[in-house]
Amino acid sequence: FIDSDAIFIESNYNEQLLRNSTRGAMDRARVKSGVGHLCNIDAGRFIGRVYNLSARKPANVTLMHLSSDHNTPDHALADFMQASGLAAEALCVRAAPREAVGTEVRLALGPHRRL
């Protein structure tokens, strides 16, 4: 993720919406577990760290795999921006729609670098 131009990351659930969900306790626990899904806050914190460690800053972040039961695009974006600590002008963040084709993102391959 470091020095990436574009990042696509899961932002599956809002913690309050999950907590208030009608889904059973076992399902809610699975979603939050280490083998479950990434919450909006954790996605934001992670990308905030990536941004700060990157010499070449990412220009675009797309939040993906939003839960239809425990998230909305507005929740995902608000949670992400608050947790990332980044200013809205720092990068373009969008939430991919669940049921439709979203904004087209064009990617180009740059020069190969050895790790």
Name every feature range the model reports, one short phrase each:
Residues 2-95:
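Cap/insert and terminal regions of metallo-dependent hydrolase folds
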Residues 1-3, 99-100, 104-115:
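Core dinuclear metal-dependent hydrolase active-site scaffold
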